[in-house]
Amino acid sequence: SNPDFLKKELGQAGLRLWFHANGIDESNVHKPYKAKSHGLGNSQILPRDYVKQRDIEIILREMAEQVAIRLRRAGKKTTVVSIHLGFSKQEQKRSIHTQMKVEPTNNTSLLVSYVLKLFHSKYTSGAVRSVAVSYSGFVDESFALISLFDEVDKLEKEERLQTAIDSIREQFGFTSLLKATALEDASRSIARSKLIGGHSAGGLDGLK
């Protein structure tokens, strides 16, 4: 096999496989590979205290989706999902910061489920005033781990739908396609999109 092809498809792991298969000591060929710890994320201070769990979940879902779009635009998949929740001063509670390692993905549905899983694992009660969602530990989007239990057809359909939605938002703006929850009082998608065109001040970095 061509080592350049393997490196393109599988990254450094593919190159190491080629060295191993051809009996080459890779330590004499290049320096050990060190992954750069870059990340993508959004954070926001809420306009009021969010007390209801469902309201906080709406915010987390929106942010998880927004960062997932940026992840796909960067051509990456994440292996680490993190959230941060800051409480109202009146709560006198320590903020929550938690993360989990996941199989490489940039699938919105999966990332939303991971973010909510982290939230449910740590949050019990209290008025939340700031929220952050971030993804890190990137690999190239061509990287895929398919197990015997994966529903490949379903994943491919989700990917095609995701691509179509991304394309529409790229052309007409993020708010051109929103879930029904965007009309609820707890939602921040529409309000944030109006701040300086929906860019960094609105927390929708890189999104129209």
Which sequence ranges carry the predicted segments?
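Acidic, metal-coordinating catalytic segment for phosphate/diphosphate chemistry
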Residues: 97, 101-208
